[in-house]
A protein has these predicted regions:
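Secondary-structure boundary/capping signal
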Residues: 18, 59-63, 109
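Hydrophobic beta-strand-centered segment that forms part of the acyl-chain substrate-binding groove
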Residues: 52-86
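HotDog/MaoC-like acyl-thioester-processing domains
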Residues: 6-8, 12-17, 79-81, 88-122
Length: 122
């Protein structure tokens, strides 16, 4: 699983909230093929995975994405950006958790994701 570890550092963590960083570098393989308007852009699927991994760290367990309630991109995330991810647990029922994740770069909102995950049964 280490080859898919996308979270670089956890800055703060409580029982219901976590703040973490993803340093976006040109060396990431996704930039070879994801060019928009002659500019490498971090794919939304990778951003979704980063936010999901931050959620897993918050919950302290491996989860599976059950539902994307909403996802909105406000700005492109490009090499050199430091994506600050804040994930908040909104509600938990058993092994099902509703979360919201917000990604910012230099204080400017890049993405917001409302999602539901299910804990691994093992």
């Amino acid at each position: 699983m280490d080859q898919m570890k996308l979270v670089d550092r956890v800055l703060d963590k409580s029982s219901n909230k976590i703040i973490a960083l993803k340093n976006v570098t040109i060396n990431e393989p996704c930039f070879r093929d994801h060019i928009i308007d002659n500019e490498p852009v971090l794919p939304g699927s990778i951003i979704l995975e980063v936010i999901g991994q931050v959620g897993d760290i918050l919950l302290g367990t491996v989860t599976y994405l059950a539902k994307v309630d909403s996802m909105r991109f406000y700005e492109k995330t490009i090499p050199g950006d430091q994506l600050k991810i804040e994930v908040v647990k909104l509600k938990s029922i058993g092994k099902i958790h509703k979360l919201i994740g917000v990604g910012t770069v230099d204080g400017k909102r890049h993405v917001e994701l409302k999602f539901t995950v299910r804990e691994d049964d093992e």
